[in-house]
């Protein structure tokens, strides 16, 4: 629901302002169909299931870093039932929040991100590119590595807070990778912090939305330091 064409346009404007261009535009939404088909593959291999619990119930069962989580009561649904329910989600026959699709990994993993993460949810929202073609949307971790693989990216560079995600990134790739193609690798680095300024997108958005500062545009000035 946070997707908006203005953010896409702002990125393009910033790249142009820096004096660069690009050969090809790529969007994760271009891969929605492939991601959906891979999700059906996971279900068919009994590696994903439709969970009908509320988000609060799912969170309560996740456990803690020191305590294992608990299996969902829907974890052992049959492949046939999961396939039917997931197709109903895609066809818009399910209200938001009623079902989610989760990967079936390990609820006792010391890495809490591996405890049956949600990979699809229902959302009745118009997407800036796909419009209303899709009512199910893939979660970040499912989209990340798979998009890198589709684009044949060799290395995905992330800041250090994504280090715990690497195990999940690799698990998802294990399910779809072809040995004849490039297998992406996630690598992390320390984020650059600048003194006496703010670079956090969340904090900058707060400042702009509350009229504490103005949104800079290339029409306003040519020097961002001015």
Feature locations, PLM:
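Hydrophobic alpha-helix position signal
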Residues: 15, 42, 173, 207-208
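Active-site cores that bind ATP or allylic diphosphates and position pyrophosphate for catalysis
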Residues: 1, 9, 27, 44-186, ...
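Short beta->alpha linker loops
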Residues: 30-33
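Single conserved hydrophobic/aromatic residue that forms the stacking wall/gate
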Residues: 216-226
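Alpha-helical scaffold elements adjacent to nucleotide-binding pockets in ATP/GTP-utilizing enzyme cores
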Residues: 7-14, 38-41, 168
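A charged helix-plus-loop insertion that forms the helical arch/lid used to bind
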Residues: 4
């Amino acid at each position: 629901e946070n997707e908006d064409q203005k953010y896409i346009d702002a990125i393009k404007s910033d790249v142009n302002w820096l004096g660069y261009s690009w050969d090809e535009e790529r969007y994760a939404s271009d891969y929605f169909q492939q991601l959906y088909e891979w999700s059906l593959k996971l279900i068919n291999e009994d590696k994903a299931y439709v969970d009908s619990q509320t988000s609060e119930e799912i969170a309560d069962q996740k456990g803690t870093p020191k305590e294992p989580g608990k299996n969902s009561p829907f974890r052992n649904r049959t492949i046939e039932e999961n396939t039917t329910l997931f197709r109903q989600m895609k066809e818009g026959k399910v209200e938001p929040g009623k079902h989610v699709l989760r990967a079936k990994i390990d609820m006792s993993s010391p890495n809490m991100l591996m405890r049956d993460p949600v990979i699809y949810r229902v959302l009745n929202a118009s997407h800036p590119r796909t419009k209303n073609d899709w009512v199910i949307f893939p979660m970040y971790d499912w989209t990340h590595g798979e998009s890198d693989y589709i684009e044949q990216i060799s290395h995905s560079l992330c800041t250090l807070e994504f280090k715990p995600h690497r195990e999940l990134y690799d698990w998802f790739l294990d399910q779809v990778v072809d040995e004849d193609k490039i297998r992406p690798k996630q690598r992390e680095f320390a984020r650059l912090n600048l003194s006496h300024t703010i670079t956090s997108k969340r904090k900058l958005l707060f400042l702009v939305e509350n009229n504490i500062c103005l949104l800079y545009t290339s029409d306003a000035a040519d020097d961002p330091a001015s």
